[in-house]
Amino acid sequence: MKVCCIGAGYVGGPTCAVMALKCPDIVITLVDKSSERIAQWNSDKLPIYEPGLDEVVKKCRNVNLFFSTDIETAIKEADLIFISVNTPTKTCGNGKGRAADLKYVESAARMIAEIAQSNKIVVEKSTVPVRAAESIMHILRANQKPGIHYDILSNPEFLAEGTAINDLLNADRVLIGGEETPEGHQAVEKLSWIYEHWIPKQNILTTNTWSSELSKLAANAFLAQRISSINSLSAVCEATGADVSEVARAVGLDSRIGSKFLQASVGFGGSCFQKDILNLIYICENLNLPEVAAYWQQVIDMNEYQKRRFSQKIIESLFNTVSDKRIAILGFAFKKNTGDTRETAAITVCQTLLEEGAALDIYDPKVEPEQIIDDLTHPSVTESPEKVKKAVQIHSDPYSAVRATHALVICTEWDEFVDLDFKRIYQSMMKPAYIFDGRKILDHERLQQIGFHVQTIGKKYQRTGLLRSWGIVPQL
């Protein structure tokens, strides 16, 4: 069997790499219009960072895994084609800011219809709205050549960036949706056969196409909902003296609830959660379900509130002004073990501090400096890109980033931040030295013993400037 994947991004790359590793009898070609991206996949420096990905790619590349810009040949030769292109939120027109923009999916479908010379199984890998498969099939059949048959399947990914390789190797389930026809069942069996090379058959769930499409949106909505739920309680904890970590542990020990995704933080980010919930909201609005749309909108609103609230906590704690103060930002990716900055909470934090006149010293072990500057100078973030460039300095190590700063802000939960020499950091910072732990990963008691004024999420905090004027050292 020959497989083609259109789209060499965060989903297509790791998925095809693991598939090639586990299916030596299958030839997989990953194609993309970007020659630069394909050149990176064929080099020693891959276009995305994902733990374990390098090793898998190097083992399979040019054996049964190929990266190419020759989309036409790959489509012609393939028996099965994954569509794994970006589905961003629309930025203009009907559904602006909510609906998924399916222009890349449509483009891929039209390419397949134009190029295909034999029967194809076409698989939605991208996250799409419910009934998107119907649109793809309409395009394929409207341009169908005589004697060519298409089957459309939905096979959403359930990967978490930073653990994608492990998620693929040890998937708790694989979901395949297809048409409830004899031909549809045969197509499902063929895709299932690929996964059965390494996934137990009982972990492969088959549904109709529409259930599969909605399940992906629902999964991300549920995960984001849990984060917003615990973050909402973090505000209550700060106002009452409760500790959100203790609350989360008590709640998570209930077997009906579980402990995953109950870590309070500065907020969720990434390419999926917000985009998919906005898509779900748009679907609900168009189905005349305003109460359902409002319910899921609150998950987004709470996340934005949490990011703003944390940013304001920094300003208020620093005597209600950060003008001309240097602040170190440790971590810019939306989570650890990835270089992805899409919808990262760090952008909101940095934007707020820059608007208040702060100068920022930023360090992230995997995000390229150019990416950080691009994010902070984007028109949606600032109207003064040159001013931002002057106020932001990117560092190659955390110790240079914190030197002579007034405060240190943890925006990403990188493991290396836990093991930093905080005595050395304290000595190099301006006094009083502040730490704002937006990911709750540090030993706050030890930091206080060193001399830091520590603020975190989900513990009662007080206006430190006022208390200090009374000679009181604030506690967490």
From Swiss-Prot:
- State any GO BP term from the record: Wnt signaling pathway
- Give the record's pathway: Nucleotide-sugar biosynthesis; UDP-alpha-D-glucuronate biosynthesis; UDP-alpha-D-glucuronate from UDP-alpha-D-glucose: step 1/1
Q: Where is NAD(+) annotated to bind?
A: 7-12, 32, 37, 85-89, 126-127, 161, 272-275, 342
Any matching Pfam family: UDPG_MGDP_dh_C
Provide the gene name from the record: sgl
PANTHER family recorded for this chain? UDP-GLUCOSE 6-DEHYDROGENASE, UDP-GLUCOSE DEHYDROGENASE/UDP-MANNAC DEHYDROGENASE
What NCBIfam families does this protein map onto? NDP-sugDHase (TIGR03026)
Supply the SUPFAM superfamilies for this chain: 6-phosphogluconate dehydrogenase C-terminal domain-like (SSF48179), NAD(P)-binding Rossmann-fold domains (SSF51735), UDP-glucose/GDP-mannose dehydrogenase C-terminal domain (SSF52413)
Q: What is the lineage of its organism?
A: Eukaryota, Metazoa, Ecdysozoa, Arthropoda, Hexapoda
Q: Which domain of life is it from?
A: Eukaryota
The similarity annotation says: Belongs to the UDP-glucose/GDP-mannose dehydrogenase family.
Where's the active site on this chain?
A: 272 (nucleophile)
Stored Gene3D superfamilies: Cytochrome c1, transmembrane anchor, C-terminal, NAD(P)-binding Rossmann-like Domain
A GO molecular-function descriptor? NAD binding
Q: Which InterPro entries match?
A: 6-PGluconate_DH-like_C_sf (IPR008927), NAD(P)-bd_dom_sf (IPR036291), UDP-Glc/GDP-Man (IPR017476), UDP-Glc/GDP-Man_DH_C (IPR014027), UDP-Glc/GDP-Man_DH_C_sf (IPR036220), UDP-Glc/GDP-Man_DH_dimer (IPR014026), UDP-Glc/GDP-Man_DH_N (IPR001732), UDPglc_DH_euk (IPR028356)
What EC number(s) has UniProt assigned to this enzyme?
A: 1.1.1.22
What positions does the entry give for substrate binding? 157-161, 216-220, 256, 263-269, 334-335, 439
Protein name from the UniProt record: UDP-glucose 6-dehydrogenase
| Alphabetically ordered keywords of this record | NAD, Oxidoreductase, Wnt signaling pathway
